[in-house]
Amino acid sequence: MNIYKAFLITTIGGLLFTAAWPTYGFFPLVFLGLIPFLYVNEFYKEKNIFLVFFVGFFIWNITSTYWLSYATIFGYLFACTVNSFMMTIVFYLFRKVKIKTNEKLGFIFLITIWICYEKLHLVWDFSWPWLIFGNVFSESTWIIQWYEYTGIFGGTLWVLVTNILLFKIYSNYLKGVPSKRLIYTLISILIIPSIISFGIYKTFEEDGEIKNISIVQPNVDPYSEKYSITNNDNLNYLKNIIEENKIKNSLIIFPETFFSEGVQINSYYYNELSNKIRDLNSKHKNEILSGIELYEVLYDSTELKEFSNKIGDNRWINIYNSAIYFSDKTDYYHKSKLVVGVEKMPYRNILEPILGQVLLDFGGLSLTRGFQKRRHAFKSSNYNISPIICYESIYGEYLTDYVKDGGKVLAIITNDAWWDYTEGHRQHFSYAKLRAIETRKNVIRSANTGISGIIDSKGDEIIKTEYNQETILSGNYKENDIITFYVKYGDYIYRIALFFVIIIFSYYLSLKLSPRK
């Protein structure tokens, strides 16, 4: 096989993954996407195979997440390059282990190290889990109802095993070796989980207490308008929304950073904004959840946190992208999965002394945002709400901590206008369906210029808005206190995978380092 053919084959693999990806994709193609890479690994023997793998994965990344370029060209190219490089390293390690050990151990290593790579993208500072294999089924929720037991890594495992079995069957065909047993195994692995899932989907009865909800989608352009609107302007907008639509006895949610002017934490409870909202709630018997920018000014260096920003001599500021809840008491939560390069500098202690403060400016203050260490559910006498802010909604195990803290509904507030009419905001809405299944919780979602809506605990859309539409959705959702297997045990598939990676890679190293006889 020459290099041009190898490049063509891995490019086809990358395009198969793109063609499978939601929301426009045909998901069964994901069961074929890895086969071209496995084929090249088997039949291409040149030393530049790393580059061949990289090109295929890069094609997948740039075509699947092209919408990132609408917000930042640099961020788009950086994310695609780093992610493709990591995928290539994983596949190259698989190649080395397979050659040194044997085919069976090699394939087990590929499955387990790929899962570990995906988990890394959920926890490290350059976090970018958008292309985790398990996300690919978000528009076909009838087939992955078992995510309540496995989370998205169950989907990743399914994709990897199926690709490997299909490749082995094809490889045996080329060699004239019968594959009857492998074919039966493949059919079982494809059909049995699908039947089980469809059965759950058809028989699942959603339980819970019915609640009233009004979801506001203001449709404000974040590039030109949002950060020039005062909190008082938005307060008047909020008041008019409630009174013109006669909203009473309801939970009302507004999107991320709806109040973007900034409110000092030590005065938020007593300031004019909070007092007026509480008066409105008292008058109309409502409760309000909204995005807000909170901050605190520090004058004592002993009180500094890792995300504190210096703004003068002996003065620092902590800024938070927060959610605030006005009920019979007032509560707040700080977004803690921050967007790399926009809300936080990765590995700040290392990079900031070298690069300085180089966060991208999309409005507001271009300073590192703060976070909190624990998830926190808002609780009142009427509601138990998990306040999930934007990017946090794509982290499965992370969200289970809200449920463990008493959250009975997943409330996502976001601002998805950065990417225009692309797959970006559509995929972000679609991925919320996975969280609904994993936790068996309803999702209520307020997006500023995105897609707002309600998703039930099977992952079905109950109601949703269009993009670029100023509107209010009024409806009902259900709160329940279900604790799923996945909520209880989290990403246990990753922990099992890590065990196998350590064992197999240690064995590989022992073979590599041992003296030849």
Give names to the regions the model predicted.
Residues T141-I143, L190-N281:
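Membrane-interface segments at or immediately adjacent to transmembrane helices
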Residues W21-P36, W60, Q217-P218, N249-Q264, ...:
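Short, conserved active-site loops that position catalytic residues or coordinate cofactors/metal ions
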Residues P255-K517:
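Solvent-exposed soluble domains appended to multi-pass membrane proteins
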Residues A79, N83, Y227-L235, T422-H425:
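Flexible, glycine- and charge-enriched loops at secondary-structure boundaries
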Residues V90, F94, K239-I242, I277, ...:
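Generic structural signal for well-ordered alpha-helices
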Residues D125, G208-I210, K283, E438:
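Short, well-ordered coil/turn elements that cap or connect secondary structure elements
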Residues M1-F204, Y421, A432-R435, A447-T449, ...:
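Membrane-embedded alpha-helical bundles of multi-pass enzymes
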Residues V40-N41, W67-L68, L93, I241-K248, ...:
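Alpha-helix C-terminal capping segments
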